[in-house]
Swiss-Prot record:
This is Crossover junction endodeoxyribonuclease RuvC. Mg(2+) 1 binds at D9, D145. Its EC number is 3.1.21.10. It is found in: Cytoplasm. PANTHER family: CROSSOVER JUNCTION ENDODEOXYRIBONUCLEASE RUVC (PTHR30194:SF3). It comes from Chlamydia trachomatis serovar A (strain ATCC VR-571B / DSM 19440 / HAR-13). It catalyses: Endonucleolytic cleavage at a junction such as a reciprocal single-stranded crossover between two homologous DNA duplexes (Holliday junction). Mg(2+) 2 binds at E70. Binds 2 Mg(2+) ion per subunit. Its cofactor is Mg(2+). GO terms for biological process: DNA recombination; DNA repair. The RuvA-RuvB-RuvC complex processes Holliday junction (HJ) DNA during genetic recombination and DNA repair. Endonuclease that resolves HJ intermediates. Cleaves cruciform DNA by making single-stranded nicks across the HJ at symmetrical positions within the homologous arms, yielding a 5'-phosphate and a 3'-hydroxyl group; requires a central core of homology in the junction. The consensus cleavage sequence is 5'-(A/T)TT(C/G)-3'. Cleavage occurs on the 3'-side of the TT dinucleotide at the point of strand exchange. Its main location: cytoplasm.
Length: 170
């Protein structure tokens, strides 16, 4: 039995998503991935509507066991923080309306799970995720958001396995 975990790297212009298949608790394989591209010409409310609609469709089609997002962090520009927070809210709503549990991890936790160090660059995450999952397409410059989404999903898979193993040892 395989479980699907969906990682989402939220954004107000580009939102990367990636689904991994976890088989027998230990084997992780890429399932599907992509980007939701939001037009800068659209009003913010219409971008959020498009994001909600497209992610909701993917959730319905794929039926993941979990959705994984980055925790909110503060940008230098307060407006960017607010807009990203609203995009995260849209994603939380899309998942909760379909009864998919949402898990959140700090960016450095996801980077550590994928690369081995929490302060890894986006390029390092991209390279390592591409190698670990054998997805050469991730190395394209505009696929950083997808690589981050894969890293989030992998982080959750690893931490869930760790929690399961801890339970068996107690």
């Amino acid at each position: 039995m395989a479980d699907l975990i969906m990682g989402i790297d939220p954004g107000t212009l580009v939102c990367g998503y990636a689904l991994i298949k976890v088989e027998n608790r230990y084997h992780i394989h890429p399932h599907s991935f992509g980007k939701v591209k939001l037009s800068q010409k659209l009003a913010l409310a219409h971008r959020y509507k498009q994001l909600f609609t497209e992610i909701s469709t993917i959730l319905q089609q794929e039926s993941p066991k979990a959705v994984v997002l980055e925790t909110q962090y503060v940008h230098k520009n307060p407006q960017s923080t607010i807009k990203l927070g609203m995009a995260r809210g849209v994603l939380l709503l899309a998942a909760s309306l379909q009864d998919v549990p949402v898990f959140e991890y700090a960016p450095n936790t996801a980077k550590k799970a994928a690369v081995g160090k929490g302060n890894a660059s986006k390029k390092q995450v991209q390279l390592m995720v591409s190698k670990l999952l054998r997805v050469p397409d991730l190395l394209a410059e505009d696929n950083e958001d997808i690589a981050d989404a894969f890293a989030l999903a992998m982080c959750h898979a690893h931490l869930a396995l760790y929690q399961d193993l801890k339970k068996t040892l107690v």
